[in-house]
């Protein structure tokens, strides 16, 4: 599901840091902003662990904010929701839940709630953004500068390419990356 992109009139991200080494409260994102959204925000909202994340996604759904979710974050969300459902069913152990589930394809085939949750996610109307080779190269450059792991760097590479003025995440490592205005839920 894709929406219309940010205006070509938006200014490019500056090369100098716009934010300090900490995040701003998620509720402070200004109306009309284009926001790259990390998986953890989606999970906290889905699991109702953060009313601030729920309210943030409601702002995106209403069109007040323009939420962008890079495809790797969508894949992470699917994976996380599968594991959450399997845990709720008491089908997997906590030690290595992904391995436990991968060894039981019969259980994977029986999972169903995560699909409904993904359909609800897509119905919000967030822009799902595919990534290309240039994004991967940019993510590697970001990794060299910041020490972030791959998917975190991909989130920032997409945010930079799309000129998103904000990044929504609960990840403190991302909040320390320079050159990005990072917003985090204050209720976690």
Predicted features along the sequence, with ranges:
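Short, well-structured N-terminal submotif of metal-dependent ribonuclease cores
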Residues: 2-73, 80-96, 188
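Active-site neighborhoods of divalent-metal-dependent phosphate/nucleic-acid chemistry enzymes
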Residues: 2-14, 20-26, 112-166
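A residue-level structural signature of the nucleotidyltransferase/glycosyltransferase Rossmann-like core
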Residues: 34, 66, 128, 166-167
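Acidic active-site catalytic centers that drive phospho-/nucleotidyl reactions
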Residues: 38-40, 152, 171
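Hydrophobic/aromatic ligand-binding patch that stacks against planar heteroaromatic rings
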Residues: 59, 158, 174
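Mobile, glycine- and charge-enriched loop segments
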Residues: 59-67, 71-75, 80-85, 93, ...
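Short loop/helix-cap segments at secondary-structure boundaries that form the rim of catalytic
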Residues: 173-180
